[in-house]
Swiss-Prot record:
Stated role: Cytochrome P450 monooxygenase; part of the gene cluster that mediates the biosynthesis of a tyrosine-derived cytochalasan acting as a fungal signal recognized by resistant rice plants and leads to avirulence in Pi33 resistant rice cultivars. The first step in the pathway is catalyzed by the hybrid PKS-NRPS ACE1, assisted by the enoyl reductase RAP1, that are responsible for fusion of the tyrosine precursor and the polyketide backbone.
Gene: CYP4
E.C. designation(s): 1.-.-.-
Name by which UniProt lists this protein: Cytochrome P450 monooxygenase CYP4
Natural source organism: Pyricularia oryzae (strain 70-15 / ATCC MYA-4617 / FGSC 8958)
CDD domains (UniProt xref): CYP503A1-like
Length: 534
């Protein structure tokens, strides 16, 4: 057996590695070459041998090391279950260790779970010490999915240029919303049913695409389909990886991510002609500042925003493709989840639609929203924040992957490699903070804003210790202003043009996932009926 291993596997690998060394190939490239050799040059006996050796190795590792798991030295109690999610772990941890941090361990991840009292300390920890991007990168196999690999240039572009452009782009985005609904929902003289999850994804993907890649590509069905399925393929791959034994995961991960990679290749093919044109325009323009001014009759110059921040060496077509894929990915599932739950609540509270219609009538002129961040829509803002409070996309907030050790005032020592989070549901459902916390109250935050001195607080987009959905501090969600604007434009179009309803009113069956996030109930059907607008 050892002779077969040496002659069939080890020796060919060493020869190939030495031969290819001058080419400076990556491990992945070497792995692909070895795979071809193994499949096309070896006999069936060798392939079977490799599979058996992998299985034997896994079994032996489980027998010898399976019960010798070591945990970092953090000085915290440990709560471990065989669950694939964290809901039961958090409940047990809070019962055993109320108001203190503990390490929660499920079948895949180890999180240090902090109470909300640690909010201010955690939010001030700098990114070089503990990073939310690295947290997302680790939890979503970022080296394959690209999640969590956003450059600082991309983040700054979203935070600054994109956010500043939003007021002037409101009329354009209203037109994008109308085109999107005409295409996806259409005129519904009678009630027409739609799957709420997939419809929410498609609406947000199409409207956002018109902003980022322009209306021509945004109206391209292939592009919209690729954006819609991008998070679904990543979710599919990550789920399979999480269910795979550790020893086999590196071998099977490329196979699991193949659909996601093919989807990315399709997106790159669609993007390249547009990016080639825009990069050439940027290179040939002497006064590049003129290219950075959004014009109402043109697409948003998002490519030029990015190019103005990158150095010439870093501003490659490859980097821009990655940026566009990342911004399409990150802006779609979270906003679609918020729309999903807002429509679910709207269908159960039809009186809310009439309240929002009256409010819209006071700010709209000839059907047009004002060129602002739409902060005038206080009732709609309160509705969206209340829905976001009851239906977060994840039960955790201030998620951080620790890169450098730190210690908090509670005495917990957090070493590198640990993931730290705060339980957001402790805030969202707290009876000490909210009256009737489990009930939907569309005017909850509107009433709070009406109190003297509170007008700049309790907005949907606000980051604070009682608004955990966006995070807080320097690592708060950079796209929250864009997402809020998108949702208000979409909700305005819906309440002015449609009535929505549910045939079956039942509690949502949101699925808790292994990394603490929630997957919306994909069985909900919602019905649209066009209003008789005079």
């Amino acid at each position: 057996m050892l002779s077969l291993l040496e002659t069939k596997i080890i020796e060919p690998f060493m020869v190939v590695r030495q031969t290819l060394a001058p080419l400076r190939l990556s491990r992945w490239q070497i792995f692909k070459h070895m795979t071809r050799i193994l499949i096309f040059s070896s006999n069936t006996r060798t392939i079977i041998f490799c599979v058996l050796m992998s299985l034997v190795g896994y079994i032996v590792s489980r027998i010898i090391w399976g019960r010798q798991e070591k945990y970092p030295d953090h000085g915290l109690p440990i709560v471990k279950t065989n669950d694939y999610h964290f809901d039961n772990i958090v409940a047990e941890g809070k019962r055993l260790y109320p108001n203190q941090a503990f390490m929660g361990i499920n079948k895949r991840y180890k999180f240090v779970i902090y109470p909300s009292s640690s909010w201010e300390e955690l939010k001030r920890i700098p990114e070089q010490t503990a990073s939310i991007m690295d947290f997302q990168h680790v939890c979503n196999s970022g080296e394959w999915s690209l999640v969590g690999g956003e450059t600082h240039e991309l983040v700054k572009t979203i935070t600054a240029e994109l956010t500043r452009s939003l007021p002037a782009r409101v009329p354009n985005r209203q037109q994008d919303a109308k085109m999107t609904f005409d295409t996806i929902i259409g005129h519904c003289p009678e009630e027409k049913g739609f799957n709420l999850l997939m419809t929410s994804l498609e609406i947000i993907a199409k409207i956002n695409a018109c902003t980022f890649v322009g209306r021509e590509l945004g109206a391209n069905k292939s592009w919209v389909t690729a954006v819609v399925y991008s998070p679904l393929w990543v979710y599919f791959a990550v789920t399979l990886c999480n269910a795979t034994p550790d020893i086999l995961r590196p071998l099977l991960r490329p196979l699991f991510f193949l659909p996601a990679l093919r989807n990315y290749w399709n997106m790159q093919k669609l993007l390249k002609p547009k990016l080639d044109r825009e990069m050439e325009t940027f290179r040939q323009t002497d006064d590049k500042r003129k290219l950075l001014v959004p014009k109402s009759d043109q697409d948003l110059p998002f490519t030029h925003f990015l190019l103005s921040r990158y150095t010439e060496a870093a501003a490659t077509i490859k980097q821009l493709v990655i940026d566009y894929i990342q911004v399409s990915y990150t802006s779609t599932p979270t906003t679609a989840s918020a729309l999903f739950h807002a429509l679910w609540e709207l269908a159960q509270h039809p009186e809310a639609a009439e309240v929002m219609r009256r409010e819209l009538a006071t700010v709209m002129i000839d059907g047009n929203l004002p060129k602002t961040h739409l902060q005038e829509l206080k009732r709609m803002d309160s509705f969206l924040r209340e829905s976001f409070r009851l239906h977060p996309i994840t039960r955790f907030t201030l998620q951080r992957y620790v890169k450098e050790p730190f210690q908090l005032s509670d005495g917990s020592r957090i070493p590198p490699g640990v993931m730290a989070v705060v339980d957001a549901q402790e805030i969202n459902r707290s009876p000490e903070i909210w009256e009737n916390p489990d009930e939907f109250d569309m005017d909850r935050f509107y009433r709070l804003r009406e109190i003297s001195g509170n007008d700049n607080r309790y907005h949907f987009v606000t980051t604070s210790s009682n608004s955990p959905g966006w995070g807080d501090g320097t690592q708060a969600c950079p796209g929250r202003f864009f997402a809020t604007s998108t949702l208000k434009i979409v909700m305005a179009h819906i309440v002015m043009n449609y009535d929505v309803s549910l045939r079956k009113v039942a509690p949502l069956k949101s699925q808790p996932l292994v990394n603490g996030s929630y997957s919306p109930d994909d069985s909900v059907e919602i019905f649209f009926k066009s209003r008789n607008v005079e």
